[in-house]
Protein backbone atom coordinates (compact mmCIF):
# COMPACT_ATOMS: atom_id res chain seq x y z
CA UNK A 1 0.00 0.00 0.00
CA UNK A 2 1.46 3.43 -0.90
CA UNK A 3 2.27 6.06 1.67
CA UNK A 4 -0.37 8.59 2.64
CA UNK A 5 0.89 11.99 1.59
CA UNK A 6 -0.07 15.37 2.97
CA UNK A 7 -1.59 17.94 0.65
CA UNK A 8 1.39 20.27 0.30
CA UNK A 9 -0.65 23.43 -0.22
CA UNK A 10 -2.65 22.77 2.93
CA UNK A 11 0.47 21.81 4.90
CA UNK A 12 1.91 25.27 4.25
CA UNK A 13 -1.26 27.08 5.34
CA UNK A 14 -2.60 25.07 8.28
CA UNK A 15 -1.07 23.66 11.46
CA UNK A 16 -2.51 21.10 13.83
CA UNK A 17 -2.35 21.91 17.54
CA UNK A 18 -1.58 19.36 20.22
CA UNK A 19 -5.27 19.07 21.08
CA UNK A 20 -6.19 18.43 17.44
CA UNK A 21 -7.50 21.87 16.48
CA UNK A 22 -6.51 23.43 13.15
CA UNK A 23 -4.87 26.87 13.17
CA UNK A 24 -4.46 29.18 10.20
CA UNK A 25 -2.98 32.59 9.50
CA UNK A 26 -5.68 35.08 8.42
CA UNK A 27 -5.57 36.80 5.05
CA UNK A 28 -5.69 40.53 4.17
CA UNK A 29 -2.50 41.48 6.00
CA UNK A 30 0.25 41.37 3.39
CA UNK A 31 -0.10 44.59 1.40
CA UNK A 32 -2.35 47.63 0.94
CA UNK A 33 -2.51 48.15 4.69
CA UNK A 34 -2.36 51.94 4.72
CA UNK A 35 -6.13 52.40 4.66
CA UNK A 36 -6.81 49.69 7.25
CA UNK A 37 -7.29 50.53 10.91
CA UNK A 38 -4.48 49.65 13.32
CA UNK A 39 -6.82 47.55 15.44
CA UNK A 40 -7.76 45.50 12.40
CA UNK A 41 -4.12 44.92 11.42
CA UNK A 42 -3.26 43.97 15.00
CA UNK A 43 -6.15 41.50 15.09
CA UNK A 44 -4.93 39.90 11.87
CA UNK A 45 -1.53 39.11 13.43
CA UNK A 46 -2.69 36.22 15.54
CA UNK A 47 -3.46 32.72 14.32
CA UNK A 48 -7.10 31.73 14.27
CA UNK A 49 -8.75 28.37 14.84
CA UNK A 50 -10.89 27.01 12.02
CA UNK A 51 -14.54 26.17 12.55
CA UNK A 52 -15.38 22.53 13.17
CA UNK A 53 -16.83 21.97 9.71
CA UNK A 54 -13.61 23.13 8.03
CA UNK A 55 -11.41 21.27 10.51
CA UNK A 56 -12.86 17.96 9.38
CA UNK A 57 -11.93 18.70 5.75
CA UNK A 58 -8.39 19.80 6.60
CA UNK A 59 -7.70 16.76 8.79
CA UNK A 60 -8.56 14.49 5.85
CA UNK A 61 -5.89 16.06 3.63
CA UNK A 62 -3.31 16.37 6.44
CA UNK A 63 -2.96 12.81 7.74
CA UNK A 64 0.32 13.44 9.61
From Swiss-Prot:
Q: What are the BP-aspect GO terms?
A: translation
Q: Which PANTHER family match?
A: 54S RIBOSOMAL PROTEIN BL35M, LARGE RIBOSOMAL SUBUNIT PROTEIN BL35M
Organism of this sequence: Symbiobacterium thermophilum (strain DSM 24528 / JCM 14929 / IAM 14863 / T)
Show the Pfam families listed in the entry.
Ribosomal_L35p
Q: Which residues form a coiled coil?
A: none
- Its GO CC terms? cytosolic large ribosomal subunit
Instruction: Write down what this protein is called.
Output: Large ribosomal subunit protein bL35
Q: In terms of domain of life, where is this protein from?
A: Bacteria
Instruction: List the InterPro entries.
Output: Ribosomal_bL35, Ribosomal_bL35-like, Ribosomal_bL35_CS, Ribosomal_bL35_sf
State one molecular function term (GO). Answer: structural constituent of ribosome
Extract the NCBIfam families matched here.
rpmI_bact
- Region Disordered, as annotated, extends over 18-39
Family to which the UniProt record says this protein belongs: Belongs to the bacterial ribosomal protein bL35 family.
